[in-house]
Amino acid sequence: VGPFEFHDKIPLKRNYKALGIRVVPHAIARYGSFIDKGVIMMPSYVNIGAYIETGTMVDTWATVGSCAQIGKNVHLSGGVGIGGVLEPVQASPVIIEDGCFIGSRCIVVEGVRIETEAVLGANVVITQSTKIIDVTQENPIEYKGIVPARSVVIPGSYTKKFNAGEYNVNCALIIGQRKKS
């Protein structure tokens, strides 16, 4: 294959074996990211300032943005996009707490917090303005910017009126609680 070539202001992280991190080609982590022992990085990208704790899997083509915080034993499935935040200074990082499962092609950005052991099904997109609707009770409960612990979440939509008519808008639906395992 030949040497890996790049040009950047910041070098890439090195010495993965000594750090106790399993890194599969072509995974990349920028210097200034923290990756704990026991993390597995499939071909993926981890930006400066990101923090990833032990036992976490960053699967193929997943990206962990600058300053994002990923807890212990998290699974970031293939193609997941975790947003970063280097600026503006007052912006909050995305936080994925311990034991979460983030399904394939999910996007979590803008300082959203996913609490302990929550599960996001494939293709869930959550921003600060995304309605997260708990539909497990008689009356729905709405959240924004936070997914409660152990929630099981799938993509959904709701109808919204606009001047030009009614249209479906994406949301995230809490459809249950993660079972004990």
Predicted regions located by residue number:
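Terminal amphipathic alpha-helical/low-complexity segments used for targeting or macromolecular assembly
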Residues: 1-21, 150, 155-181
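Structural signal for interior beta-strand "rungs" in well-ordered beta-sheet cores
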Residues: 21-161, 174
